Every structure is written in C-alpha cells, then in structure tokens.
Amino acid sequence: MKYVNVNEIAAKWNLSERSVRNYCAHGKIPGVILDGKTWRIPEDAVKPVRKKRAEKIANDLLTRLKMEKEAGIPGGIYHKVQIELTYNSNHMEGSRLTHDQTRYIFETNTIGIQDEVVNVDDIVETANHFRCIDQIIELANYPLSEAFIKQLHYILKSGTSDSRKTWFAVGEYKRFENEVGGSATAKPADVSGEMRNLLKRYNLSKQKTLKEIIQFHYEFEKIHPFQDGNGRVGRLIMFKECLRNGITPFIIEDDIKEFYYRGLKEWKNEQGYFMDTCLTAQDRFKVYMDYFGLEYRD
C-alpha cells in the first residue's frame, strides 16, 4: 500500500494540515500509521464526513414559538399557547366548546363532537383564533398599528354569522354604539381618531413595560372600537406586545376572569387590582416556560 504525508492529503481534501492531523489522532482515517512524529496516510484514504453540529434549541419564547410553528412540532410551547389562549379567551366571551374540544380541533383540524348541539360560530372562531395567534407570532416584532389591529379582527370574525350581517363591519371599526359591562364606550364617529391618538401615545416609547401594555389594554377596551370581538383582540394584542418587549406573556384563565373584569373596571382609580391579576397569570405562564426550558427575565 502506498502512503502519503499530511500536507499531500491536506491539499487533496482542501483542509488544513491541523485538521488532517486531528482526524488521524482521533482514528477518523482507517489505516494511518504514526511513524515517529509523522503520520503516514493511505493514498486512497477517504475524507471523513464531518458531522453537522446539532442546532442549539432556542431558549427565548418568541424564537421557540416561531421555530415550532414553522416546523409543525406537536406538544411544545407553541402547541400549549394555541390551545390555552384560544380556549380561555373564547370561553370568556361565551364559547361553549370544552378545553378538550378546542385541543381536538387544533390537533386534528376536525370537530369530532357527538350527541351535542354546538354553535357553529364557536367552531369557526376557534379555528380563526388559532390563525390570529399565528399572526401575532409572525408579526410580534412589528410596531402596533391600526392596520394590524383591524387585521386581527378580520381574521377572528371571518366566516361567522356576524360577518353575514350587513351592519357588522368585519375588520373595520364599529358602525353602532355599544357598551361594555354597562359602561359607555367611544362613539362610532370618534373611534378612528381615538385609536390613532392611543397608538401615537403608546408608540412614543420603544421599550414597553408591563404596566404600559396593560394601560393600552384598558384604553383599548374603553374605546371598544369593534362591534364585537374587542376582548379577544385586546388580549391578543397584550400577548403580542409582551413577546415584542421580552416580557413574560400571560393568559387570563377562567378562575381569574372576574378579577380581570374588576381590574378593567377599577383601573382608573386602583391599578393594583389589574396588575395583580396579570402578575398571577404571568406566574402561571412561567410554569409553562420552566417546563419547556425557556428563559424569562422578570
């Protein structure tokens, strides 16, 4: 058998001499001989295939959500957020779908409901809410705008019975007065101006605090810009803005929804109610993040 030296193999394989010596020392090239301090390598040796380094799994929430969404990975944090946020936010607005039914729709894209009368809108809005979550993940780093907010409403309400009503403006601001919790909201003629002013004030600072995000939510719900769907759109916005600003997001679950409503009602006089509710929800979300090995700063 004919042997060659390290420099010849390095030139042949387009590698550094150091790399070739490392291959020899680690037994990656069959048949090599160490003659004193010189490696003798079979002339017909095959260049070792370098193993690709395993990609490091992102440990920040937004990157992981995007990665799992794009790869279609089941059972991860993306899967968890889709089911928990959709179920709880829709349930607050009167959806009668159970948690298991919500999960089944997400996982199988089928209904699978027997011997039960189910409102079609509950199913449509559940599927639509999944798409809304995809939207806030994809566009999380973009500044909040009227166009984005209207787009969320359009996605949420498309294909529902509301969308077939001539007076209901899907993806557009309300045409008729409405109330929230018995309290007056912005007049339809004033909504556009109030939303522009709200967004202008909010977007003055680049890095938002949790309190600023909650303040925006309070003002958004007070305006109540859409005919219906304001609560869900508002909570989606809070989740998106937490992602954008590196703040642990949160999901308002059924057992704390009354505290959430009280917090909204009392925000102007006592901000502690709403802050405490959101911090409680945040602590619960941190349990998810700990489980999936994700870091958080707050």
Regions found by a protein language model. Name each.
Residues 1-13, 17-29, 34-298:
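FIC/Doc superfamily catalytic core
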